[in-house]
Amino acid sequence: MKLSPLPVLLVEDEPAVMAYVRAALERSGYPVVCCESGVEALRLLEGGSFLGVVSDMRTPGGVDGGQVHAWIARHRPDLAGRVVFITGDIANEETVATLRETGAPCVEKPFRVQQFIEVIAKTLGKV
């Protein structure tokens, strides 16, 4: 297995979920940079290069996954088609609206690693 030359930015505030997703990505050849909030994600996106972004829909600090995607669309359009959302709240009206607006794929928690990695490979490319 070869490694991607660029890391995936993982935005997830739940430590157990972050560890699970990070391990799944790394085992599949994707290096990972983790952060716990949308605010931190924006800071990292301003100065870093990433293969793509995996973001929880709900993150602390006043900037959620949808707002991270909106920022990416404005400031890093090269990444706009390489965002994957993860959420345990797929039926929430705000989540549904964000998914409709962005067109980004979403994997509902809890999920199987194989299901998640299939979405990642389709969205970010296989490594």
List the predicted regions and their residue ranges:
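Charged docking surfaces used in two-component/phosphorelay signaling
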Residues: 19-27
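Phosphate-coordination loops involved in phosphoryl transfer and adenosine-cofactor binding
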Residues: 3-6
